[in-house]
């Protein structure tokens, strides 16, 4: 699989190009989800409103506000996976802080297996046990001034949900509609990623815990503490 390398306006960000090719891109298979500005993805979970998730790493809590108002499918997918216990025990398989703080990425279900080859982490996604296929969700980004998110494509407009410090967003392959379960925390303001990756919430408490995450650390537990009633599952 060939990765698309973003073009940067400043030479000082060139190092990020190489990082992006392996950190934010996953090894997901190409998506079959159609691109659309006004889709009706009835087969995917959806969050109507907001919810709160507490993710515990090495005994310390991280509180995340998940935003279904501006990213209903992306937020719904994450909340559903949290509720299913998918993230419990998973590893942060890539953490990049040098030469500048970048991301802490986790959520590959393969990382639950301590014998899984570390070099292959970052290639996995959530396999729906009923359908026995990987659940893929569309790239979902809401531009400022728009009533609804855009789907299946990157945008040049400023999004409502930006990559500020503490943002949580979905990792994906170079195919826009290929996110599944892998996510990342922004360890700095990463505005050059805006419009290309789907932010769906922010850390509201415990950013110091996020800043201490090391590669290889595991998620003890993630649980929905507020707003579960706002999660709408496919019928």
What are these regions (language model features)?
Residues 2, 28-235:
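Cross-family detector of peptidyl-prolyl cis-trans isomerase
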Residues 2-15:
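Bacterial N-terminal signal peptides that target proteins for export
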Residues 15-26:
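Bacterial N-terminal signal peptides
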């Amino acid at each position: 699989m060939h990765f698309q390398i973003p073009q940067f306006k400043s030479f000082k960000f060139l190092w990020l190009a190489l990082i992006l090719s392996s950190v934010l891109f996953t090894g997901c298979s190409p998506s079959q989800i159609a691109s659309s500005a006004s889709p009706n993805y009835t087969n995917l979970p959806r969050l109507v409103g907001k919810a709160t998730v507490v993710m515990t790493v090495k005994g310390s809590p991280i509180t995340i506000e998940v935003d279904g108002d501006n990213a209903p499918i992306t937020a719904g997918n994450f909340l559903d996976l949290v509720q299913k216990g998918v993230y419990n025990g998973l590893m942060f398989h890539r953490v990049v802080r040098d030469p500048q703080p970048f991301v802490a990425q986790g959520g590959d279900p393969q990382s639950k297996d301590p014998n899984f080859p570390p070099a292959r982490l970052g290639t996995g996604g959530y396999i729906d046990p009923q359908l026995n296929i990987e659940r893929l969700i569309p790239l979902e980004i809401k531009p400022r001034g728009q009533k609804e998110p855009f789907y299946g494509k990157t945008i040049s407009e400023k999004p409502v949900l930006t990559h500020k410090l503490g943002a949580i967003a979905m990792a994906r392959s170079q195919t826009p509609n290929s996110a599944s379960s892998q996510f990342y925390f922004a360890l700095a303001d990463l505005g050059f990623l805006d419009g290309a990756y789907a932010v769906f919430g922010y850390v509201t408490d415990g950013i110091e815990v996020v800043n201490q995450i090391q590669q290889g650390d595991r998620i003890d537990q993630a649980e929905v503490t507020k707003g579960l009633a706002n999660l709408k599952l496919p019928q």
